[in-house]
Amino acid sequence: MKVHKGDTVLVIAGKDKGAKGKVLQAYPARNRVLVEGVNRIKKHTAISANQRGAQAGGIVTQEAPIHVSNVMVVDSDGKPTRIGYRVDEETDKRVRISKRNGKDI
């Protein structure tokens, strides 16, 4: 998956289209990412859950994962870009680059 934890992304589709946020967690097996402040849902928790160390019962607002196809990584110039790879000559490792300007991400 080309989007990693810590990346700044722009939501390009869905109810939060146009929102920017930081990737809090990536789920490569499910092709989803958790973005800060995006796709917020209300989760109803039972009062009995308090015995297991959770918060008191009620309605909790939290982020839900969003599909990776609905986000684009924001490059160093602050514009959304697609991601490509190149091989670093010194370390022989893959490095992510911006397809828009060719710079490393």
From Swiss-Prot:
One of its GO terms (biological process) is translation. Gene3D superfamilies: 2.30.30.30. Keywords: Ribonucleoprotein, Ribosomal protein, RNA-binding, rRNA-binding. The keyword rRNA-binding applies. GO terms for molecular function: rRNA binding; structural constituent of ribosome. Pfam families: KOW, ribosomal_L24. GO terms for cellular component: ribonucleoprotein complex; ribosome. SUPFAM superfamilies: Translation proteins SH3-like domain. CDD domains: KOW_RPL26. InterPro entries: KOW (IPR005824), Rib_uL2_dom2 (IPR014722), Ribosomal_uL24 (IPR003256), Ribosomal_uL24_CS (IPR005825), Ribosomal_uL24_KOW (IPR041988), Translation_prot_SH3-like_sf (IPR008991). PANTHER family: MITOCHONDRIAL RIBOSOMAL PROTEIN L24. Part of the 50S ribosomal subunit. Belongs to the universal ribosomal protein uL24 family. One of two assembly initiator proteins, it binds directly to the 5'-end of the 23S rRNA, where it nucleates assembly of the 50S subunit. One of the proteins that surrounds the polypeptide exit tunnel on the outside of the subunit. This is Large ribosomal subunit protein uL24. It comes from Mycobacterium leprae (strain TN). The gene is rplX.
